[in-house]
């Protein structure tokens, strides 16, 4: 019998790619998603890509009783990969209570139900934002956790502490915290990608929409960074590679390969790429007839959500080669 994995936020950008990789690896997947930033059509596309249709339950993870019913319906769930969360940095500044409610309570509900239903482990979708403004580059897992730069980043920090405190209290739960950098790209089939409801929050959707004329120009925030071209440098990681990292992590928990009950891994490439370099690479790959119009904008307070240079000093090879 295939081992069952619950994926919250499984119709989202990273979640949908992870569901495909889980199914390709022989897992049976149950998706829980409220579709607040995605579409049920994604389930159809997952089936087209993998040849397997995952179980899907439209449900908000704030609904404790609803989650309890899902665990009861799909008995024997062995692990959880928890993506479901509100994730827009700017919006979190405007709506902090929404973010604290959505991002904290959803995790608490899962942790409360895991022992009851015999779930062995959880992979938590964390973020490089937990490092705040790092002192050294590249950023390793040993880097100190600094003051969060937004309510969104703070929810990631708090959730990590919630997991640690829960495990320390004697809970039988095992956990891996994946702190990843900047997911980018799409599935090679082009059936899955970053298709948010409403206004995009990341660079690539804006870039593609500008290239096909949906948007008149692409806004780049800042040209005065201490970088070769003046634009922000990020560590971009392909979303399929990121999805595979989640499969490796769940394998690690279920095969009891962990060295500690709570482990942390940075997931990135360890190489920096500037925003303008990425735009130029995009133009070359798709062979645009004319350059994508770019407007440089500046935000107040030096854009605290943008860390000028952030690269991962990854420990991921430790779990790839376990």
Spans of model-derived segments:
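Conserved NAD(P)H cofactor-binding loop of Rossmann-fold oxidoreductase domains
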Residues: 84-87, 126-127
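Residue-level signal for the nucleotide or nucleotide-sugar donor/cofactor binding architecture
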Residues: 62, 94, 102, 150, ...
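Hydrophobic alpha-helical membrane-insertion signals
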Residues: 280-322
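Catalytic helix-loop patch of NAD(P)-dependent Rossmann-fold dehydrogenases
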Residues: 94-97, 101, 105-112, 116, ...
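N-terminal Rossmann/SDR dinucleotide-binding element
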Residues: 2-79, 199
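C-terminal substrate-binding subdomain of Rossmann-fold SDR/epimerase-dehydratase oxidoreductases
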Residues: 209-284
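N-terminal Rossmann-like NAD(P) cofactor-binding module of classical short-chain dehydrogenase/reductase
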Residues: 78-81, 123
